[in-house]
């Protein structure tokens, strides 16, 4: 008993209780009891236990390192009671990702902050956590979300945090059947008017936009098969941009062809008449220096007082006259033809070239291309004018001869 106490006192080296300098003992220095300080946490009975005799001490919480930081504390120069032992900080675990000491645990970016009532209840429900994660992903604009939503129409009515993709919905079968029936009945003109669209919208309980979109797709997918079953060409009953471009180019080409063909029509009557088999008709139509007015005035009458489509009439007339008719019939027809409206071209032709320039016939704009459905009621009028002109030229030829 005395040996143990002396050993402890030798190891401590000072009767003070606030420090225990290492006086050569290999055991951890613990403060010894002091008779005048009842706050000491160790008693002589504990220090005299058999464990001390064997040179071992039980593990006890260490004293604060601040009390051992100075030499005075190590030497036990003060007899003040030791401060209460501070709470030992928990060992900081190493971060598996960074390999360094991690700080105090913070909530993860995907984890909802806990409320005071949920402190002991564990994490938030899984559904709310997933919704929050999807909302953050949608707000950050990740590439995967953009790639997935390329072929999906933007739904502005739904909230951004829902994260649910709007599935493609099909129209009701009753509504589709009504639209199909209307399409089959009007398959040759499958373009409903605004009133018909409104009526179909009421019958099918769909919006007008849905009806319009359905007809746009049906004309491209359903209508061609319907028309082929009837033996019709789908391109003739549908309007497309490609067909419109083709029709525009064909119309431009036709107009250019007509304009290029106009000079040939203007020159053919003179050459064909001179080349006719009857020499009596070819002689008066040949140009002569004695009567230049009649030769120069004739193109103005034919080209500027009639339509372009009738320019080939003198050519056919000259051929028919050159085959078998004689000039007596032409003279009789010319005498019986007494319309005053046709005397105006005759007067202009009898006068010289100076009067033709003053009358303004040469300044008239060229005629427009003829319509394919144009009425050819003026054909007989042109025939009569040509007969009268031929008779007059025959008389002039006889007088000059």
UniProtKB/Swiss-Prot annotation:
Protein's name in the database: Homeobox protein TGIF1
Species the sequence originates in: Homo sapiens
DNA-binding region location: 164-226
Any one cellular-component term (Gene Ontology): nucleoplasm
A GO molecular function held by the record: DNA-binding transcription repressor activity, RNA polymerase II-specific
UniProt KW keywords: Disease variant, DNA-binding, Holoprosencephaly, Homeobox, Nucleus, Repressor, Transcription, Transcription regulation
Record motif CTBP-binding motif, residues: 153-157
Function: Binds to a retinoid X receptor (RXR) responsive element from the cellular retinol-binding protein II promoter (CRBPII-RXRE). Inhibits the 9-cis-retinoic acid-dependent RXR alpha transcription activation of the retinoic acid responsive element. Active transcriptional corepressor of SMAD2. Links the nodal signaling pathway to the bifurcation of the forebrain and the establishment of ventral midline structures. May participate in the transmission of nuclear signals during development and in the adult, as illustrated by the down-modulation of the RXR alpha activities.
Keyword NAD: no
Family: Belongs to the TALE/TGIF homeobox family.
rRNA processing keyword on record: no
Subcellular location: Nucleus
BP-aspect Gene Ontology terms: amacrine cell differentiation; cellular response to growth factor stimulus; determination of left/right symmetry; dorsal/ventral pattern formation; fibroblast proliferation; negative regulation of cell population proliferation; negative regulation of gene expression; negative regulation of retinoic acid receptor signaling pathway
Residue span of region Disordered: 1-34, 78-127, 139-170, 274-293
Organism phylogeny: Eukaryota, Metazoa, Chordata, Craniata, Vertebrata
Quaternary structure (record): Interacts with SMAD2. Interacts with CTBP, SMAD3 and HDAC1.
PANTHER family per the UniProt record, alphabetical: HOMEOBOX PROTEIN TRANSCRIPTION FACTORS (PTHR11850)
UniProt cross-references to InterPro entries, sorted A to Z: HD, Homeodomain-like_sf, KN_HD, TALE_homeobox
UniProt disease annotation: Holoprosencephaly 4: A structural anomaly of the brain, in which the developing forebrain fails to correctly separate into right and left hemispheres. Holoprosencephaly is genetically heterogeneous and associated with several distinct facies and phenotypic variability.
The organism's place on the tree of life at top rank: Eukaryota
């Amino acid at each position: 008993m005395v040996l143990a106490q002396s050993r402890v006192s030798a190891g401590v080296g000072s009767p003070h209780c606030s420090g225990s300098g290492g006086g050569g003992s290999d055991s951890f220095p613990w403060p010894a009891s002091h008779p005048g300080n009842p706050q000491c946490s160790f008693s002589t009975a504990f220090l005299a236990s058999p464990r001390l005799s064997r040179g071992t001490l039980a593990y006890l919480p260490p004293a604060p390192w601040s009390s051992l930081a100075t030499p005075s504390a190590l030497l036990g120069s003060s007899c003040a009671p030791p401060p209460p032992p501070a709470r030992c900080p928990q060992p900081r675990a190493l971060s598996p990702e960074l390999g360094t000491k991690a700080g105090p645990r913070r909530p993860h970016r995907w984890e909802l902050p806990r409320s005071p009532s949920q402190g002991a209840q564990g994490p938030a429900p899984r559904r709310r956590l997933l919704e929050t994660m999807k909302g953050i992903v949608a707000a950050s604009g990740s590439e995967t979300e953009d790639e997935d939503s390329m072929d999906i129409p933007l739904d502005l009515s739904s909230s951004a945090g829902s994260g649910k993709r709007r599935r493609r919905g099909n129209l009701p079968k009753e509504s589709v059947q009504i639209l199909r029936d209307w399409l089959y009945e009007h398959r040759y003109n499958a373009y409903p008017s605004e009133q018909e669209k409104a009526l179909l919208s009421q019958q099918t309980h769909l919006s007008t936009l849905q009806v319009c979109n359905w007809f746009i797709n049906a004309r491209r997918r359903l209508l061609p098969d319907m028309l082929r079953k009837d033996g019709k060409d789908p391109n003739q009953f549908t309007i497309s941009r490609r067909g419109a471009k083709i029709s525009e180019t064909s119309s431009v080409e036709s107009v250019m062809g007509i304009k290029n063909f106009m000079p040939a029509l203007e020159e053919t009557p003179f050459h064909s008449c001179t080349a006719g088999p009857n020499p009596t008709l070819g002689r008066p139509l040949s140009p002569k220096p004695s009567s230049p007015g009649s030769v120069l005035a004739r193109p103005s009458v034919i080209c500027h007082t009639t339509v372009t489509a009738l320019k080939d009439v003198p050519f056919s007339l000259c051929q028919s006259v050159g085959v078998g008719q004689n000039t007596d019939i032409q003279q009789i027809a010319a005498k019986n033809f007494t319309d005053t409206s046709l005397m105006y071209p005759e007067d202009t032709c009898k006068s010289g070239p100076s009067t033709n320039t003053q009358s303004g016939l040469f300044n008239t704009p060229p005629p427009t291309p003829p319509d394919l459905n144009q009425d050819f009621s003026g054909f007989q009028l042109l025939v009569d004018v040509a007969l009268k002109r031929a008779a007059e030229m025959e008389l002039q030829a006889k007088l000059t001869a």
